[in-house]
Each structure stands twice: as C-alpha cells, then as structure tokens.
Amino acid sequence: MKRARRAAPLPKKRRNMFAQLGIERVDYKDTSTLRQFLSERGKIRSRTVTGLTVQQQRQVTIAVKNAREMALLPYPGQG
C-alpha cells in the first residue's frame, strides 16, 4: 500500500527587518542594532533566524566584523 504524499509546505514570506527598524544602510558604529543580529554568545545569527536577504546578511556580517575589530562588539566566546 502506498502512502499519501504530503503537499509541499508553502515558503514563509520573509519579513524585512531593515524596513521594520527603519534602516537603509548598516553602520558598524550602531551597536544596538547590530546586537539584534548576534546570539547571546556573540555569534552572528543565520539568515533563517534573522529573516534577512542575502545582501542584507552580508552587510550585517561586514558591519559586525568591523565593529569587533574596533572593539565595539565582543568576539564569540568573550562576551
């Protein structure tokens, strides 16, 4: 007896976090905004968690790395 196939789940619509926060460009000096994209251990959260587009995730990643370099944000495992 064959099993019934399940219908493929509908993809979730991505919410634009930058539009919700009123951000056009990510700035490494804006640590309060960047902390929203970090875990409690200081790691950068993935796109699936944050709901960002590829380009936005790259901007956040670069900004977080610059902020870490300038000692505005901690490196993972140190905070």
UniProtKB/Swiss-Prot annotation:
InterPro entries on file: Ribosomal_bS18, Ribosomal_bS18_sf
Annotated keywords: Ribonucleoprotein, Ribosomal protein, RNA-binding, rRNA-binding
Xref: Pfam families: Ribosomal_S18
Disulphide bridges: none
Highest taxon above the source species: Bacteria
Entry GO MF terms: small ribosomal subunit rRNA binding; structural constituent of ribosome
Entry GO CC: cytosolic small ribosomal subunit
Gene Ontology terms describing biological process: translation
Membership in a protein family: Belongs to the bacterial ribosomal protein bS18 family.
Oligomeric and partner information: Part of the 30S ribosomal subunit. Forms a tight heterodimer with protein bS6.
Family annotation (NCBIfam families): S18 (TIGR00165)
Protein task: Binds as a heterodimer with protein bS6 to the central domain of the 16S rRNA, where it helps stabilize the platform of the 30S subunit.
Name the UniProt record assigns to this protein: Small ribosomal subunit protein bS18B
Species of the source: Mycolicibacterium gilvum (strain PYR-GCK) (Mycobacterium gilvum (strain PYR-GCK))
